[in-house]
Amino acid sequence: AKQTKYIYDILGGDDGRKLYDAVQKGIDKAKALGADVIIGLGHLGVDPSSSPWTSEEVIANTTGFDAFIDGHSHTVMENKQVYDAAGKAVTLTQTGSYLANVGKMTLAEDGTITTELISTADVSDAAVAATAATWIKEVDEMLGEQIAVTDINFYISDPATGKRRIRSGETNLG
């Protein structure tokens, strides 16, 4: 069997073309069903190590998106403009990580799409904070509780070569 970057398939193919084609079919279908605005929602990221399956590459190899909300790389990204295959600017956004921001996307009557990241650092709700504190206390009390034991060491990397096995091959966990 041919060794590839990952052992699973996201319809990406080696060059991303399968993914781009599948996404384009989805965009075309949404338009055929009468969608006025097409907003992609993905978990692709923009990290070069994910190439050719990044949100920027999906946008660049398709037409029809008006905006794209992304994740995976946990990038703080507001109002980034990426050009699609037809040269149209598409708004790309991500909120970062650990709920540090909440994203707000505004669709204006003239078709303009803007995004804003609202920091959660300055936002607090007493009732939510109390509920969270209670839940966190319960979880903290459970931490350290032994629920199973095994004599087998589970490996992320191959112990003989040091090569990472997760997502690229079989591990002794499965």
Model regions: which residues?
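Conserved beta-sheet core of the metallophosphoesterase superfamily
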Residues: 53-106
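Beta-propeller domains
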Residues: 47-51
